[in-house]
Amino acid sequence: MKILLTNDDGVQGLGMLKLAEYLKDKYKVTVVAPEKERSAISHAITLHKPLRLKKVKEEDSLKIYAINGTPSDCVKLGIEVVLREKPDIVISGINEGLNLGTDILYSGTVSAAIEAAIYGIPAIAVSRAETADIEDRRIYKFLENLIEKVLEKGLPKNTLLNVNIPDFKKGIKGVKATILGKSIYIETFQKNYDPRGKEYYWMAGKISEIEKDERTDIVSVKEGYISITPIHFDLTEYNMINILNSWDIKIE
């Protein structure tokens, strides 16, 4: 079995490298990751400069490459150039920091898994609480079990899994299938000036609404569950199709 691993934390991302080392005893693992951190870049791809591929490490069952691109670039290049065939599964992560609710729309981690789903490849995006112990082998055993289930059962077309792992030290209640919550922020921008007197802004902000629906990934992780959310990239609101047609919008 061949696994393609990527992330948005960069090729030195500890979570991804630890997972690669764990999986290499059972699978052929190829890592293709950004050469530097590309967090919150969503599904961006590189069109206006060349992509450069660098081999970082090569063993019998583990190869690591870095590219000067985005997480989605990594999946494309990994499939088309490095592997030259589709892997059995693509794993994006383990990301340092959770990817919950509508925050996934900004996530390079989740977008890399979406890119794999566009290719028709089973994919899992994995994120962990920043306080979670990256050395805890239970994290990797859980992911190994999940990978085996996905390879055995398959996933529906255009569907991937978004997994969020809380801090095991605080106690884990179990694994829970969830829906996406809503992450609503009050956006603020901190204004400052550079040494030449030109203004610039830092984006800040805070959560304005606390999600309370127990079915959601946000609440489930907060309560101590590993959250698995099935998501797909078809953003169509099908219930709106007939409504739009009924508007009878004229061209002239």
Swiss-Prot record:
Keywords of the record: Cytoplasm, Hydrolase, Metal-binding, Nucleotide-binding
Enzyme Commission number(s) of this protein: 3.1.3.5
Residues engaged in binding a divalent metal cation: D8, D9, S39, N95
Cytoplasm keyword on record: yes
Highest taxon, organism lineage: Bacteria
MF annotations from Gene Ontology: 3'-nucleotidase activity; 5'-nucleotidase activity; exopolyphosphatase activity; metal ion binding; nucleotide binding
A GO term from the CC aspect: cytoplasm
Reaction catalysis annotation: a ribonucleoside 5'-phosphate + H2O = a ribonucleoside + phosphate
Textual note on the cofactor: Binds 1 divalent metal cation per subunit.
Location relative to the cell: Cytoplasm
Entry-linked InterPro entries: SurE, SurE-like_Pase/nucleotidase, SurE-like_sf
Cofactor dependency: a divalent metal cation
PANTHER family attached to this UniProt entry: 5'-NUCLEOTIDASE SURE, 5'_3'-NUCLEOTIDASE SURE
Family the UniProt entry places it in: Belongs to the SurE nucleotidase family.
Functional note: Nucleotidase that shows phosphatase activity on nucleoside 5'-monophosphates.
Entry-linked NCBIfam families: PRK00346.1-4, PRK00346.2-2, surE
Stated name of the protein: 5'-nucleotidase SurE
Organism: Thermoanaerobacter pseudethanolicus (strain ATCC 33223 / 39E)
